[in-house]
Amino acid sequence: MGLREKLAELREEGLQDIKQSEDLKRINEIRVKMLGKKGPITSVLRGMRDLSAEERPKVGQFANKVRDELSAAIEEKRAELEQAAMNAKLAAQTIDVTLPGTPVAQGQPHVIQQIIDQVVDLFVSMGYEVAVGDEVEQEVYNFEKLNLPKDHPARDMQDTFYVTPSVLMRTQTSPMQARMLEKHDFSQGPLKMISPGKVYRRDTDDATHSHQFHQIEGMVVGKNITMADLKGTLEAVAQNLFGDKLKVRLRPSYFPFTEPSVEADITCFNCLGKGCAICKQTGWIEVLGAGMVHPNVLKMSGVDPEEYGGFAFGLGPDRFAMLKYGVDDIRNFYQNDVRFLNQFDQKG
């Protein structure tokens, strides 16, 4: 019997064995037996050295064809057996599709983020631009351009986290005032912006202080903008967060970046001005600082204070959340106690 006939016989034998295989173990045995280095096809091929130069390539091509056919048949049978095994496994498992599924807990925005979103949505509805700045800021934007000179106490190492002598973790979101003033085209109208974000100060953490907290800076600069515009804006914020009946009063204060500067108080939302423990019987609650943008701040950002003016304010979402929900310790917001945080579930 010639080599070609032997190969044909091995092919038929192999295909028959593959067809009759009933499990994966048997199909693997056939693969090793027929196609392995010690298998019959390899043994037949060793006899090719005795063939003539004319016959050798023909037999070689036929041998490769036989090997390919057997390999394809083995893989096809393997896939068939694997699918059959999977079907048998699934058939053996009883699944009651009427049983309720396992509930998956849904996340939600943190209570402070809820306050931020509420304030941002309000200002966006009033045409403000949201400007989000970097938490690592250049000292010049955090201080000089906001009219805080070199000898100002807020610039001491004991109050500020410095990264390098000229780079720091921003102590306020106010640097975005200067950055937005520098690039705004006033020929297109006034600048109306808010800048929410995290800020950092070297405070000792206690019930009312944290080394990291949140701030929302707001500013409007244009022509003919007055303190009355500021008061109306702050009343819109207070009423949006605490109720329509609240009023705002302004008291003189001092901030380096505004002149004149004011502290803004709102009617106590608990007693509506009658006096209670929350407002210490005054009927008012201090909520934020504000004022008219200092001419020096405008000048240092290339804006002519003789032509343009405006107001600025900075509110603390952390403090607003404490007031709104009666939380007496700011640390509760950051300790990740789910029992505490779930009280502010927006889904109810």
From Swiss-Prot:
InterPro entries: aa-tRNA-synth_II (IPR006195), aa-tRNA-synth_II/BPL/LPL (IPR045864), Phe-tRNA-synth_IIc_asu (IPR004529), Phe-tRNA_ligase_II_N (IPR004188), Phe_tRNA_ligase_alpha1_bac (IPR022911), Phenylalanyl-tRNA_Synthase (IPR002319), tRNA-bd_arm (IPR010978)
Record keywords: Aminoacyl-tRNA synthetase, ATP-binding, Cytoplasm, Ligase, Magnesium, Metal-binding, Nucleotide-binding, Protein biosynthesis
GO cellular component, one term: cytoplasm
Residues where Mg(2+) binds: 259
The keyword Aminoacyl-tRNA synthetase is annotated on this UniProt entry: yes
Swiss-Prot/TrEMBL catalytic activity: tRNA(Phe) + L-phenylalanine + ATP = L-phenylalanyl-tRNA(Phe) + AMP + diphosphate + H(+)
Localization terms from the record: Cytoplasm
Cofactor notes: Binds 2 magnesium ions per tetramer.
Single biological process term from Gene Ontology: phenylalanyl-tRNA aminoacylation
Main location per the UniProt record: cytoplasm
Highest taxon of the lineage: Bacteria
SUPFAM superfamilies: Class II aaRS and biotin synthetases, tRNA-binding arm
Cofactor: Mg(2+)
Molecular function GO labels: ATP binding; catalytic activity, acting on a protein; magnesium ion binding; phenylalanine-tRNA ligase activity; transferase activity; tRNA binding
Record-listed E.C. numbers: 6.1.1.20
Any Pfam family: tRNA-synt_2d
Family according to the record: Belongs to the class-II aminoacyl-tRNA synthetase family. Phe-tRNA synthetase alpha subunit type 1 subfamily.
Quaternary structure note: Tetramer of two alpha and two beta subunits.
Record protein name field: Phenylalanine--tRNA ligase alpha subunit
Organism: Limosilactobacillus reuteri (strain DSM 20016) (Lactobacillus reuteri)
Organismal lineage: Bacteria, Bacillati, Bacillota, Bacilli, Lactobacillales
Gene: pheS
